[in-house]
Amino acid sequence: MRSDDPAAAHVQELIDGFWPIHVLTALTQLELPEALASGPAAARDLAQRLGLDEFQLFRLLRAGSALGVCQDLGDRRFALTDAGALLRRDAEGSLRGDVLFYSGMSKGGFADIPEIVRTGRAGHSVTLGPEGFDRLGEDTDRLDDMHRTMVGSSRDVAIDLCRIYDFSAHRTVVDAGGGYGGLLAAVLQSCTHLTGSVFDLPSVERGALAYLKGQGLAGRAGFVPGSFFDGPPPPADCYLLKYIIHDWDDSRARQILASCRDGMGADGVLLLIDRLLPGRFAATPDHRRFARADLTMMGYGGQERSEREMFTLLHSAGLRPIRIVGHAWTLSVVEVRAA
């Protein structure tokens, strides 16, 4: 490659982006962030403790140092950086689940893109279909990893949500499809006049109740088991629907929205928290994030939607978008009422 060719350099930079996720995945799966949590250690000691090959472990930790998640101290000794600490399962704001999720996508969903584009069928759609969520509930470790990850991201979303949306007119809130209730907990802690519940599959109930109790909300927050496809969420003044619709194609998404419409009543409000894609894409950091998110959902049979696409979907489900509160890569909130 010619060093003075900016077009070639740009493509090479894109090509070189393939390997970091695999390093992070290896570090995470081998539980090296946990092993280094108590302080620096030699590759030899880590290898003996974890039953690993010393030389290959040294090479992996060296690669982790190049990525900034480990620190090479010399003499084959390594420490964990602040970034690497986020790969620990018990870290505040842990990104362990994100690493494992996108690692799976790099081996499956993204690799399937050519076939999906040829056929229009998502190879992993069963994973996020109703049967797939039931199957996920049988894998307790994977289920716990996923929902712990969602708790962290949900709390970040809730901070922004409570800043831009006034909940004073509401008394009850349902976090529909809310997992362990990270979003609900943060909203209730910010708006102390509210009570609420999580509506999700029965497999989530134990983890959700434990999390809500741990947040000091046992008296104000509960759990209602159920599925959008079997009936509406329990009645409430306000439904929260965060990053749910993008999991599904239009037909299933319409069913979910119609289920919410049936449960919310004439005076109820639905806050649809999702990404709204730009009308046109350009080579910018935010647009790359939008594209990554959309192709991720492509692999699972879902999709991100533009404002026009989302509004069309809402109207088809008997709902009326009132306004967009906040509009950014991380947070777009559409306030919705029954039509």
What positions do the PLM features span?
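Conserved Class I S-adenosyl-L-methionine-dependent methyltransferase catalytic core
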Residues: 2, 8-29, 34-40, 48-49, ...
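Alpha-helical subdomain
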Residues: 1-72, 167-168, 172-339
